[in-house]
């Protein structure tokens, strides 16, 4: 166990170290910082590294087997109303627990937190149920996505313009470290228990559909709720001068994030307890292992969220402000490329996705290749976001052509890549995006006198869009190179079914 934890921490070190070095270089060149603020950032980086290590191991031990077990049992029960109700409730409950959603709700000042949170949760619940029905009835993911995105853009034209960016960002932040491991595992369990040659390809796509639900529901909220404006609350930067101030900032925030994470995990643990009472699905040894996994997950999330919110968010705002106020505003674009390329590696849910992709494709799509594809995509997204900050161009000029390209590609790549790509979009836009990239864009927009709501907000949506294109282009290259992945998908689906059935005996 200790060896596995050390391995996960080493992996997280390699993920967080590049972005830490980038900020250090900027702090001694273009954007000088006070020593206290820099110390806050470095302490946050340490917490990120350790927290990611604990979280990845914990999710592997607890969330993944729970999701697979629930998904498999739902299919075997063959009761459609039960499947729909259970999936809706699970989607809504886990979304309410998502830390990223709490961050978003706090930033949208004009909508009461509970209204926004419950609206988004209902959206995820509805679309998780729809995603499960898609797997069971073998509906084409690419066709379903095309229909839903057309409806989405039609709906967006009837919603107030202030809500467009808010809505698209809501789709990105709701699929974070809490929801991704569980929802992906449910998909694996469902498709494995389906026992057919296309099961493995259909194990992806749940996160993609769950990301659409919040966008649609927030757009509807904008139409019917009629708030006066969707203003965001800026990041508050507390003066930090001495090392005592640094320690105090973390000590003060630690209980809040501990409470937040424990409240977030309680519904998931409740699902395990109820599921075990009703089905007796897990042996005693498995339950002990899963319990330890939940403890690791809680520790990891507390450390990660404390580090990223206390250490990273203020620095992101300072970097954006400093670069925009300098005589070299255009440096926001090349620096955005570098930050975007490396920051996605520090998203905890990304590593969970990459591991599951590598496992399910038998190594044909490795973690390294997935990391490169996601990094290139997010780098492009941050560049577009910085261009929007500097020029004020409408988000529609980016997202509409982007989704047209992504949906067009979905008809020319192996089916497994479509699911992976659209899932990657939701996964890439996690807490690092909402607590570092968003403050970066907001700081820059404020410094140049732009409209923060329409110009800076939307960066999460662009980060969620970019992997859709990047990963599918990777799929095109794979198909032209050897055609290995589609064949592998058929072989793997049988292997997964055998392993799943053996566990149940």
For each predicted feature, which ranges?
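Transmembrane helix-loop boundary segments of multi-pass membrane transporters
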Residues: 39-40, 58, 105-117, 134-150, ...
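Intrinsically disordered, low-complexity non-transmembrane regions of multi-pass membrane transporters
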Residues: 1-12, 16, 67-81, 195-206, ...
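Alpha-helical transmembrane segments and their helix-start/interface "positive-inside/aromatic belt" motifs
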Residues: 9-15, 39-45, 73-82, 141-146, ...
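Transmembrane helix-loop junctions in multi-pass membrane proteins
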Residues: 25-39, 59-67, 93-108, 127-138, ...
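Transmembrane helical segments that form the transport core of multi-pass membrane transport proteins
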Residues: 237-349
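Hydrophobic core segments of alpha-helical transmembrane domains in multi-pass membrane transport
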Residues: 17-30, 44-54, 86-93, 123-134, ...
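Juxtamembrane and boundary regions of transmembrane helices in multi-pass small-molecule transporters
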Residues: 131-146, 162, 194-239, 386-401, ...
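Helix-loop-helix junctions within the multi-pass membrane cores of secondary transporters/permeases
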Residues: 72-73, 80-151, 329-410
């Amino acid at each position: 166990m200790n060896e596995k934890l050390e391995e996960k921490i080493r992996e997280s070190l390699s993920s967080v170290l590049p972005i830490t070095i980038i900020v250090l270089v900027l702090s001694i060149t273009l954007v000088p910082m006070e020593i206290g603020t820099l110390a806050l950032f470095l302490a946050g980086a340490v917490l990120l590294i350790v927290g990611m290590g604990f979280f990845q191991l914990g999710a592997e031990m607890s969330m993944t087997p729970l999701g697979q077990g629930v998904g498999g049992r739902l299919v075997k029960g063959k009761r459609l109303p039960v499947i729909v109700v259970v999936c809706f409730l699970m989607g809504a409950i886990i979304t309410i627990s998502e830390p990223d959603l709490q961050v978003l709700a706090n930033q949208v000042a004009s909508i009461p937190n509970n209204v926004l949170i419950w609206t988004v949760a209902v959206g995820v619940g509805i679309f998780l149920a729809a995603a499960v029905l898609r797997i069971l009835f073998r509906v084409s993911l690419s066709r379903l996505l095309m229909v839903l995105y057309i409806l989405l853009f039609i709906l967006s034209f009837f919603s107030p313009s202030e809500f467009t960016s808010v809505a698209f960002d809501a789709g990105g932040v709701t699929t974070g470290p809490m929801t991704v491991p569980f929802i992906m595992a449910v998909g694996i369990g469902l498709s494995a228990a389906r026992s057919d040659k296309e099961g493995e390809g259909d194990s992806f796509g749940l996160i993609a559909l769950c990301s659409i639900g919040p966008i649609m529901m927030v757009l509807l909220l904008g139409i019917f709720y009629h708030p006066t404006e969707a203003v965001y609350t800026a990041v508050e930067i507390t003066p930090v001068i001495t090392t005592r101030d640094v320690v105090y900032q973390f000590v003060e925030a630690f209980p809040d994030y501990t409470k937040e994470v424990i409240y977030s995990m309680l519904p998931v643990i409740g699902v395990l307890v109820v599921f075990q009472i009703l089905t007796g699905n897990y042996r005693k040894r498995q339950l002990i292992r899963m319990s330890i996994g939940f403890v690791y997950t809680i520790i990891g999330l507390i450390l990660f969220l404390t580090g990223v919110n206390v250490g990273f968010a203020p620095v992101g705002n300072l970097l954006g402000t400093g670069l925009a106020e300098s005589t070299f505003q255009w440096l926001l674009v090349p620096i955005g490329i570098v930050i975007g390329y490396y920051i996605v590696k520090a998203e905890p849910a990304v590593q969970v996705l990459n591991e599951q992709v590598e496992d399910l494709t038998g190594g044909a799509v490795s973690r390294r290749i997935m990391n490169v594809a996601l990094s290139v995509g997010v780098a492009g997204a941050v560049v577009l976001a910085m261009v929007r900050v500097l020029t004020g161009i409408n988000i529609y000029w980016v997202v509409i052509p982007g989704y047209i390209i992504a949906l067009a590609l979905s008809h020319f790549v192996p089916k497994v890549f479509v699911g992976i790509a659209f899932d990657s979009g939701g996964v890439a836009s996690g807490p690092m995006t909402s607590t570092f990239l968003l403050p970066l864009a907001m700081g820059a927009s404020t410094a140049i006198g732009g409209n923060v709501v329409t110009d800076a907000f939307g960066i999460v949506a662009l980060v969620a869009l970019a992997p859709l294109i990047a990963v599918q282009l990777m799929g095109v290259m794979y198909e032209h190179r050897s055609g290995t992945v589609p064949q592998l998908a058929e072989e793997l689906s049988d292997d997964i079914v055998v392993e799943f059935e053996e566990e149940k005996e």
